[in-house]
Every structure is written in structure tokens, then in C-alpha cells.
């Protein structure tokens, strides 16, 4: 047998065998062994798996003629992934070769298909076969399988692989017929042992000119040789190079435990992706959803398995997906009591939007694996479920056409590539370690950064993916896909698909969105999203920075100057203002507005206010990051020639009330410049208030919520806080560059 993958697995090997020893001038016309028209590739496959279709795609690329044996038949050749077997392949080949028993001008290459890729042309294959001087050339490997005791009977080899591998051989039809007609064993007997014993017969080996491809000129078996193989990129083609023997193999065989490495190579060879042409096969199987017809029915499964920042925004994005909601059934599993209010707020909209909905809450006490099994099985058991779309709450799909795009890719399983903003952390692994955990593939960074764009066969995907419903029903009918082992649910899921020979595809052809970081999300805060400026800066900005801030920074005429050198610009969103005030009131320990202040190094405040420092609520670092990221650039734009490090020791929220502290006496600030942000609405939350700059006799009487006043501090801008006459006024103040 060949040391191949789970049976029925078949290997694709494309060697070429020599005609009888004779000079070119002695050969009759029509019997040129380098004539591709006289070459036939025979392979074996009982089902049109993705591996088989990949093999055919590579054969079609080079215009090979392929004959497949066994399609639609039952595999009775044993579990060749775990033990000996594969004899059924020899029986099928024996019968097929009867057709060519007298074809002396014909060359046959036999290869498996599920784990084989062709990397060279028929002409190259035939030339290399002729150069081998053989009538039948087998592929070679480093292991004597399945009987190590036969190793000593093999001829010594100076350089190269010593032992026969039956996953690929090439030879004259008459010679192959002479070999396989000797098969008289059972279907689950070992094919490789059969060929090995014939090869080890010295008389037969010499009589039939049997040889091994010791240096991988034609056949590259990957098992035991991964360190020898590298990708060789040409402008519009990719192949592998064996650096140990400096050869360019024509047939690449992922025998034994090297299926994932073959998948990696198959992303490139022969034209999966090239530096000049990009993705060569991406559009080959695409199927555009026809207009005017209802699109496929989708089961959308959403999982909230841990405390997750910005969940209300995630739920609102579900309503914006560019896909007819009447064709979507929503399943939502929430494992967190903390998020129940968020889901309750959005659930009426979700119920009205989608064709059907189901909510499973924390009271069900389902593990993440059990919840995922439940959702997937609901699709599996529904004949009308055409696609299963799994989406975790820590994904941010900014491309609203994601679902439509993935369906049109027409793959059994496909995920959109998502990564954390500015990080290499993503929702896929490019390779696995020997114990099936994360390993970084050579192209991982290029894929995450989209320097190489295409559709990729990877060993692990998570957090967002689409699966065909019929794939679940026919190829993965068991329910316990996620919870059937002790491993992480996503790892168990991926292994289940890999073990079935189902490819896990990843598309990075489009910008789909990003992932959220969740590990440091602290739900002890009243509004924990406020603290996400470091971990999830893009989402934080979208939620908490004023929608017109960027336009103001770009000089689009939004910034105002109500007083000399006093600039007014939009900075914080309404939500940021509200949550900042709520955090302060929730903390509740307002200073008394006295001169004595134990929070200060000297214990004395010259111009006291009723306030709470950012440091008191644990928000100092986050606020300083806001100053660096948003206030610093604006300051340098408004005051040309000044460079700020946006340092501030005093950052605090001030509360003005008529019965508490209604105003603030004239003073200079201990800063190079001061930031003063209104946190609520005049006329709605309070009356009065405002700021007067005494030297210029200039008053700003109606501060706008979320807008910041930016002005010089010490020396020039002597100012006072005007009395608040009704309600409560809140402002955020920073003394920057003291």
C-alpha cells in the first residue's frame, strides 16, 4: 500500500517509463516515447472529493489525459490511513490494463488522486522518464513500508531515497500489464507490499527494467522529505524544488501524515497563486447568485460565549447584512448574564427583521461546544437549510456583502479572513504543530496583511465561516462535531472536517472586517467599553469619538475660533459624554471644592472645584491615550510650530450646580494649553454656565456637548467659569504639558 491518508485515499504520481533500450534512429515512427499523445494518466477515486478535484484541476492545467477508476464504487481496500491495504486499486488497474496489453507505444502513469498534485507538463514528464532508462519507474521514499524487515533486500543507493512507494509509477503499458496481471490477492491486502516483492526479485527487476525514482526527478513523496522541499516561484507558475537533489519533481504526493503540507503547496502549485498573476483558480468555480431569483436559505448562528466589547454594535450590524432577511433564520446563543440586557434591547428588532429566530440564554447552561453542536444540527436536520453561517460576537464584519461573497465562492467550507487591527492575530492558522496546535506557515504574515490575495486551503478556521447544508447532511452527519472531544470546540470542529478530507478554505480577496480582543475586557466597570481604547482602538473610535472629528482635523472648516486663540472643535461622541458622566456619578466620591486636597502632591488646590480625577476611576491611562491620539494632532494643526507630547497630570471631570459650586473664579491654568470638553447639553440639562476670557472680554455662553475648547493656559488666557443657574453642568478638563 501507499502510506497515504484516510481511505479511500489515492495518490497522484506522474512518472514516465522508457521504451526498450534502442537508439532514437532505430525506433519506428509513431513510437516516440516523448509523444504526449501516447501518455495516459490512470488514477483511482471512489468519490469526487475536493482532493480529487484539485488533482484534476492540475492535470487539466497541463493538458494531461486522465482515466479515473472506481468512481461511485464502494471502497473495500481497508483503512489505509491507519493500517495496510489498498489492494482494490491493483485489482481495478489489472482489469483496466487488459485494454492496453498490446500497446507497446503507450506509456501509463498511475497515481493516487486525493493527495496528489501535478506540477509539470506531459512533455517534461516523458523526457524525464526516458532519461531514467527504465521500463517501469516507481516513486521512492525513506521508509520501508509496510514490512521493515524487507529493507535489507533493497539494493544499496549512494544518494537518494532507497525504498519503493506505490503511490505513483510510470512505465510502458505492456510492462505495467505484466506486473499487475500477477495480482491474485484480496482487496484489503497491501498494494505497496505487492509491488515491493516484485521489485525485490532481482531477476524480474532486471528483466522488466524496474527502477526507483531515487532523486525525485518525477515523483516527490513528502513524507520524510518536508525539509527537502521549497516553493519555486516563476512569473506565472509555481512548482516545488527538491533542494537535496536539485530536482523539479513533476508529481507531488502528500503521502502519510503530510496531507496538510500538500494542501499548503497546493495553494501555489501549479498556478494557485503567482507573484505576477495573483490567484489563478479563484474564479474557476465561482457561482454568481442570479438576480431576480430568491437566494439560498441561510441559517445564521451567532455565539456570545464570553464578555465581548461593543456587543450592541455587533447586534445592530446583523440588521445591515446585505442579504434578504426573509431568507435567513437567526439562532443566537448567549452564554453571558452580563450581556442579557444588551440582547434584550436588540431582540425585538431582530425578531421583526429575520424570517425566524431562536434565542438560547445562559439559563440553559450549555457549553460553547454544545451550543455550536445544537445550532449546526438545526441546519443539518432542515432540508431547506442551504448554508450555515457561523458568526462569533467578537467579529466585526464591516463588509456587509460578506455572506453573499462567501456563498458565491462555491466552496464546501469557507471563512472570511479577519484579524485584529494592526496585529497578526487572525481567525485562521496556516499550519499545525505535530500535536495539532498553532504553527506559523511561511506565508501567514503575507496572507494576514493581504500581500498575497486569494482563496487558501488552511488547517484551521474559527469565528466566522460558511458551510454548505448538504455537506453537513452527507459528509458530516454526526451531531457531536464541537463537543465530541476534550479539545477546544473550534479545534474539534476543524479536525472533524480534516479527517473527512473536506478542505477548510479562507478568502482574503476582500476586506471583510476585523476581530475584537476580548481577554482584558473587564465587566466590573459600569461601561467597560470605555476602557477599550488600547485593545480595540478602531471600534473605540467609532463609538466614542465625534463623527466630525476627522473632518475637523483635515481642515474642512468645522473648527471655530470664538475668542482669540481659543479653538472649538468636535471631539467626543454623545455616548462618550454620557458614559463618562455615568462612570463619575457611579463612583460618587466628588471632592468638596475645598482648598485642602489630599489627592494632590502638595495637598493644596489654589482654585478648587467639585471634581473627580480620572486616576480615581482608573481611567488615567486611557484618557492620556485619547490626548495623544486625538488632541495632540489637533493642537499641532491649530498651533503651527508647536509640538506636544500630550502629557497631563491633571485630568478631571468638574460638576457645577447652583446649590453646590455654581461657578469658578478668574484664574490661569497650570498648563501650556488646556482642554475643556462639555459633557452635557445647555438648555436641556442645565441653564447658565459658560466661560469668559477676561483679557479679551470674550464669552462662550453655549458650550456644545462633545465639543472641546482648546486654549493656552498660563500667562495669556485668564478666564472664569460663569454661574450655572439651574440643573447640573459637567465638563472634562485636562491641563496639558504643565
Curated annotation (Swiss-Prot):
Binding site for UDP: 44-46, 112-114, 256-259
GO biological process: basement membrane assembly; collagen fibril organization; collagen metabolic process; endothelial cell morphogenesis; epidermis morphogenesis; hydroxylysine biosynthetic process; in utero embryonic development; lung morphogenesis
Location, primary (coarse class): endoplasmic reticulum
UniProt EC number: 1.14.11.4, 2.4.1.50, 2.4.1.66
Disulfide-linked positions: 279-282, 379-385, 563-698
Domain Fe2OG dioxygenase: 647-738
Gene: PLOD3
Protein name according to UniProt: Multifunctional procollagen lysine hydroxylase and glycosyltransferase LH3
Binding sites annotated in the UniProt record for Mn(2+): 112, 115, 253
Amino acid at each position: 500500500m501507499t502510506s497515504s491518508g484516510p481511505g479511500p485515499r489515492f495518490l497522484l504520481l506522474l512518472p514516465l517509463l522508457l521504451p526498450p533500450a534502442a537508439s532514437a534512429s532505430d525506433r519506428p515512427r509513431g513510437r516516440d516515447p516523448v509523444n504526449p499523445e501516447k501518455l495516459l494518466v490512470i488514477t483511482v477515486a471512489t468519490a469526487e472529493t475536493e482532493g480529487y478535484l484539485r488533482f484534476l484541476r492540475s492535470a487539466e492545467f497541463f493538458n494531461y489525459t486522465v482515466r479515473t477508476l472506481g468512481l461511485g464504487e464502494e471502497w473495500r481496500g481497508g483503512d489505509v490511513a491507519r493500517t495496510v491495504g489498498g489492494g482494490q486499486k491493483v485489482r481495478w488497474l489489472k482489469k483496466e490494463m487488459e485494454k492496453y496489453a498490446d500497446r507497446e507505444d503507450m506509456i501509463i502513469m498511475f497515481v493516487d488522486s486525493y493527495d496528489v498534485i501535478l506540477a509539470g507538463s506531459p512533455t517534461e514528464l516523458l523526457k524525464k522518464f526516458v532519461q531514467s532508462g527504465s521500463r517501469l519507474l516507481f516513486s521512492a521514499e525513506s521508509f520501508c513500508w509496510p514490512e521493515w524487515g524487507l529493507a535489507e533486500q533493497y539494493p544499496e543507493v549512494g544518494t537518494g531515497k532507497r525504498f519503493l512507494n506505490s503511490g505513483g509509477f510510470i512505465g510502458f503499458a505492456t510492462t505495467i500489464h505484466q506486473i499487475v496481471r500477477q495480482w491474485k490477492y484480496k482487496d484489503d491486502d497491501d498494494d505497496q507490499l505487492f509491488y515491493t516483492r516484485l521489485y525485490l526479485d532481482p531477476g524480474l527487476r532486471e528483466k522488466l527494467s524496474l527502477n526507483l525514482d531515487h532523486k525525485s526527478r518525477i515523483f516527490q513523496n513528502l513524507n520524510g522529505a518536508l525539509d527537502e522541499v521549497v516553493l519555486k516561484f516563476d512569473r506565472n507558475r509555481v512548482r516545488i524544488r527538491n533542494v537535496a537533489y536539485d530536482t523539479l519533481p513533476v508529481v507531488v504526493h502528500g503521502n502519510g501524515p503530510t496531507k496538510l503540507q500538500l494542501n499548503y503547496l497546493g495553494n501555489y502549485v501549479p498556478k494557485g497563486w503567482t507573484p505576477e498573476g495573483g490567484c489563478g483558480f479563484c474564479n474557476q468555480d465561482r457561482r454568481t447568485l442570479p438576480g431576480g431569483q430568491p437566494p439560498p436559505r441561510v441559517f445564521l448562528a451567532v455565539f456570545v460565549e464570553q464578555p465581548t466589547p461593543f456587543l450592541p454594535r455587533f447586534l445592530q450590524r446583523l440588521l445591515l447584512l446585505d442579504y434578504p432577511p426573509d431568507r435567513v433564520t437567526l439562532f443566537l446563543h448567549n452564554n453571558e448574564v452580563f450581556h442579557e440586557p444588551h440582547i434584550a434591547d436588540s431582540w425585538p428588532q431582530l425578531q421583526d427583521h429575520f424570517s425566524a429566530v431562536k434565542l438560547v440564554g445562559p439559563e440553559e447552561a450549555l457549553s460553547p461546544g454544545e451550543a455550536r453542536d445544537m445550532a449546526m444540527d438545526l441546519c443539518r436536520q432542515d432540508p431547506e437549510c442551504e448554508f450555515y453561517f457561523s458568526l462569533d460576537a467578537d467579529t466585526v464584519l464591516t463588509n456587509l456583502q460578506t455572506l453573499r461573497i462567501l456563498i458565491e465562492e462555491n466552496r464546501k467550507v469557507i471563512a472570511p479572513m479577519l484579524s485584529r487591527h494592526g496585529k497578526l492575530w487572525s481567525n485562521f492558522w496556516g499550519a499545525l504543530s505535530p500535536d495539532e496546535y498553532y504553527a506559523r506557515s511561511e506565508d501567514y504574515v503575507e496572507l494576514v496583511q493581504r500581500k498575497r490575495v486569494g482563496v487558501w486551503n488552511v488547517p484551521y478556521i474559527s469565528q466566522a465561516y460558511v458551510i454548505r447544508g448538504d455537506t453537513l447532511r452527507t459528509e458530516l452527519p454526526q451531531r457531536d462535531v464541537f463537543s465530541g472531544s476534550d479539545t477546544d470546540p473550534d479545534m474539534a470542529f476543524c479536525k472533524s472536517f480534516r479527517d473527512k478530507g473536506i478542505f477548510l478554505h479562507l478568502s482574503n480577496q476582500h476586506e471583510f472586517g476585523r476581530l475584537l480582543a476580548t481577554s482584558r475586557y473587564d465587566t466590573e466597570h459600569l461601561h467597560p467599553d470605555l476602557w477599550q481604547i488600547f485593545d480595540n482602538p478602531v471600534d473605540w473610535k467609532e463609538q466614542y469619538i465625534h463623527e466630525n472629528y476627522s473632518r475637523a482635523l483635515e481642515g474642512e472648516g468645522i473648527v471655530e475660533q470664538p475668542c482669540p486663540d481659543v479653538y472649538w472643535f468636535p471631539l467626543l461622541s454623545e455616548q462618550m459624554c454620557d458614559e463618562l458622566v455615568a462612570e463619575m456619578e457611579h463612583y460618587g466620591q466628588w471632592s468638596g471644592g475645598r482648598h485642602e486636597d489630599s489627592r494632590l502632591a502638595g495637598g493644596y488646590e489654589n482654585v478648587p472645584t467639585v471634581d473627580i480625577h480620572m486616576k480615581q476611576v482608573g481611567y488615567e491611562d486611557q484618557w492620556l491615550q485619547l490626548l495623544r491620539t486625538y488632541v495632540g494632532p489637533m493642537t499641532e494643526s491649530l498651533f503651527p510650530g508647536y509640538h506636544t507630547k500630550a502629557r497631563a497630570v491633571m485630568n478631571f471631570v468638574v460638576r457645577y450646580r447652583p446649590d453646590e459650586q455654581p461657578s469658578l473664579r478668574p484664574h490661569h491654568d497650570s498648563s501650556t494649553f488646556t482642554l475643556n470638553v462639555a459633557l452635557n447639553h445647555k438648555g436641556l440639562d442645565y441653564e447658565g454656565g459658560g466661560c469668559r476670557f477676561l483679557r479679551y472680554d470674550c464669552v462662550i455662553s453655549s458650550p456644545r456637548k462633545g465639543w472641546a475648547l482648546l486654549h493656552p493656559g498660563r500667562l495669556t488666557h485668564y478666564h472664569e467659569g460663569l454661574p450655572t443657574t439651574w440643573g447640573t453642568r459637567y465638563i472634562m478638563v485636562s491641563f496639558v504639558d504643565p
